[in-house]
Every structure is written in C-alpha cells, then in structure tokens.
Amino acid sequence: MIEADRLISADIQQPEEEIIDRAIRPKLLAEYVGQPQVREQMEIFIQAAKLRHDALDHLLIFGPPGLGKTTLANIIANEMGVNLRTTSGPVLEKAGDLAAMLTNLEPHDVLFIDEIHRLSPVVEEILYPAMEDYQLDIMIGEGPAARSIKIDLPPFTLVGATTRAGSLTSPLRDRFGIVQRLEFYNVDDLQHIVARSASFMGLEITAEGARQIAMRSRGTPRITNRLLRRVRDFAQVKGNGEIDEDIASKALDMLNVDAAGFDYLDRKLLFAIIDKFMGGPVGLDNLAAAIGEERETIEDVLEPYLIQQGFIQRTPRGRVATNHAYRHFNRIMEAP
C-alpha cells in the first residue's frame, strides 16, 4: 500500500493539487492560520532580524506531514524580502550538490531543506561550517597533494524541515538557533482554512459545510484542502454546486472518511490491535506484518494522529488500543 494512494494522505498527490495549494497558500504571517505560538514567536524573530539588518537565525521546523512546514519557509522568505531556495535531503547526494546551492545564495537568502534528517553524513559535514561561520570547506585534489580551501558565504538562513526530529544528529540539531514544532490544527482553525480555500476556488460553502470538512481532516490543512476538492466534485454532480452540511457529510461518507477522519487504513490498524491482538500490547513489527505496511508508515503517518486523539497508546511492551477506540467502533473493552 502506498501512502500517496490514500485520500487522507498528507502528501501532495497530483500536479493539479500542487498548483491549487500554491495559489491558496498564505504568503505572510498575517494570513497564516493556526499555530499561534509559532506565529507570534516568528513575528518577533523576523522583526528583530530586519531591525538589525541580519539574516534570520537558522530554523528547524518539525512535526507530522501536511501541517505547513514548507508554507512557513515561504512566509519567512517573503517577510524577510529575500529569495527562497528549495531542496531536500535525499536530493543532496554529494558534497558538491550542497556546495553549488550555498555558493549561489544572495545575502540573507533562505535555503529550505525538506526531509533534512535524510542528509548523508558527507553532506552534513559540509553544512556545519556553513551554518556556524558562513564558510565552505572544500578539499581540492586527492592523496598527499590534497588541500583544503575556504570559501566565504554570504549570511543566510537555513530552514530545515523534518517529520522525524529524533533522527537528526545532535551536532546538526544543536546548530539551529530556532526550533519550532507544528501541532495538529484544531477544528476552528481548519474551518477557517476551508472557508478561505473555498473563497480562492470560487466555491459557495456554508459554515456548517466547512465545519463538516474540518472535523474529518485529521487536524491537517493539506488534507482539509484535498477533502474540499473532492466534496466540490460531489456538490457539482449530486447537488447545485453549493457545499452545505448535508452535501459535505454525504460526500465524505461516500469517500469512506468517517466522523473522526479515519479511512480504511486507520480502521485496519485499529481493528488489527483490537481483534487480532486482543487490544494489545503488540509490537510494531508484528503490527506492521499484520496490516501489510512498513513500520515507518505506521510510525510517521498513522500513529501521530491516533495517539494525539487518544485512540492508541505507546507502551514499553507495544501499541495498545484505548477505551476511546473501542467506543468509536461500538466495541466493549474486555477486562484484562
């Protein structure tokens, strides 16, 4: 099963979706919905850097996928009035790949590295002096004739994004002056995002219809916008084009997204714990084998929301389905 196949995947799926997402993506902090603590702190840090005519300190953003890490990087570049250069950890295979990007930066530019936890050790070593001293150490030649030269870099801001902050090496993590964690969004903020996106897309939507979509979006704006597009299709074919509570509810039910935002893969995971393993505890490897998924998919994609909403617990002995999960599926939790 590929994560991108899921309707409620937090990954970008189609080029059309990416184009729409870029169009409706907020450009400034004033337009940024949710994450009030992050927004307030970044506003202060950005203003202070601009007053000093300095580059913003290096920033690490972590949290589950789809919560706006790339959006925040774009906003920072816009607020600072500088260019944004974008790449990702897996793309930077050799030290020369990173060196080429660094030497093309203008003063105070933002370099955004997505999936920064996947940088190779060789590339990471190049990054240390670049972050600390704005210098690039390059080896010229090989063997006894090899020598190191230093290239000065303009002051820049590195923005690293990751879903797995614990996978970063300590030396890399310690070089970020600002660390921000993005949390799952509440329903009110997601409803605001639905209404804003619908306005950009020229859709008529009621407050109740927007809330129905928000409630089933797993706290994730990217999923919110994806569900909105699918509900739009349903409203245009089965209704008069307007999205009200009834249309939204029927569309999402047809798409097998339930009231908690679960799809078949979430239910498969929870039913495996409840039925196959008697509610748990069950080890991650056994659980992955039982549902035919990679353990990384469970850890990075499924579990964060289920744990945050109180449907499963991680224990030293494995994963356990909570009373909340049993109630959601109208099951009775047997006494141990």
From Swiss-Prot:
Entry keyword annotation includes DNA damage: yes
Annotated positions binding Mg(2+): 70
CDD domains the UniProt entry points to: AAA
Catalytic activity: ATP + H2O = ADP + phosphate + H(+)
List of residues binding ATP: 24-25, 66, 69-71, 132-134, 175, 185, 222
SUPFAM superfamilies, sorted: P-loop containing nucleoside triphosphate hydrolases, Winged helix' DNA-binding domain
One MF term in the entry's GO annotations: four-way junction DNA binding
Protein name as catalogued: Holliday junction branch migration complex subunit RuvB
Source organism: Proteus mirabilis (strain HI4320)
Lineage: Bacteria, Pseudomonadati, Pseudomonadota, Gammaproteobacteria, Enterobacterales
